[in-house]
């Protein structure tokens, strides 16, 4: 029983890990724009979390890197990322054990907070 659950869990993770970041990026932007936020704000949060800049993010999008490679090659995960807490996709981000999945959910969470109208300073854990 547990072997089957572990296999299902692993397969679900692998599907997300190998998903192209370029295929999800426009969805992040659409989610934000539907709620009156901008592409620039989405990018600001991606830069804040990962250390990418305009040029390196464009390279990631052009190359079609998957999420695993996107985070493996990220210049520097922001140390304040550990302050991101809450539920996203049914999971508490601070309790996710897999480091890569946690990083992906950090990104999902801050984009969700942006779409919900939270101030950038609060999303970036500056206050």
Where are these regions (language model features)?
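Short, positively charged and aromatic/hydrophobic N-terminal segments
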Residues: 4-10
């Amino acid at each position: 029983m547990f072997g089957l659950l572990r296999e299902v869990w692993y397969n679900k993770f692998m599907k997300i890990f190998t998903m192209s970041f370029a295929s999800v990026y426009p969805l992040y932007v659409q989610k934000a724009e539907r709620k009156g936020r901008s592409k620039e704000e989405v990018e600001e949060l991606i830069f804040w979390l990962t250390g990418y800049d305009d040029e390196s993010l464009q390279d990631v999008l052009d190359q079609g890197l998957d999420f695993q490679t996107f985070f493996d090659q990220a210049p520097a995960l922001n140390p304040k990322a550990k302050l991101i807490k809450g539920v996203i996709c049914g999971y508490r981000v601070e309790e996710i054990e897999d480091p890569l999945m946690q990083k992906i959910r950090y990104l999902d969470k801050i984009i969700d907070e942006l779409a919900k109208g939270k101030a950038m300073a609060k999303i970036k854990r500056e206050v």
